[in-house]
């Protein structure tokens, strides 16, 4: 996730913003870290974006759970976004980026219903490996995300993420 965010956030946020991606070793480590970081971060004008894979969770319940962890810090300038269902769904939503990253032709797949709504794919990583057998999560994230177009992605969760980040950075800071 960090690799992708490091590459795509500069395409979304103004140049006047800086950001830091903090990876966590698993979802429980992230959940434990949220209240600590949101309460303890003393630097002024800091905004938090928390990104979490949906996997098999109920999206709305997961998002509510993460916002509840933030509530105790009284920090309002925080955005929670859920990737449905895996990060690879975002890649499958932009097959042009996959084509460019792996120098292959995927035009036969672009019209398929499955790739017009990649968020419904239960195992996006496996589906991506069917298209790109050499795909590996970390190197593949770097390879594909550098070609991602933030304005042309069939993943609804990606588009909601982009929209949320844009709205967060245009709001006045506390």
Language model regions located:
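C-terminal accessory helical subdomains adjacent to catalytic cores in phosphodiester-
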Residues: 2-22, 28-49, 54-174
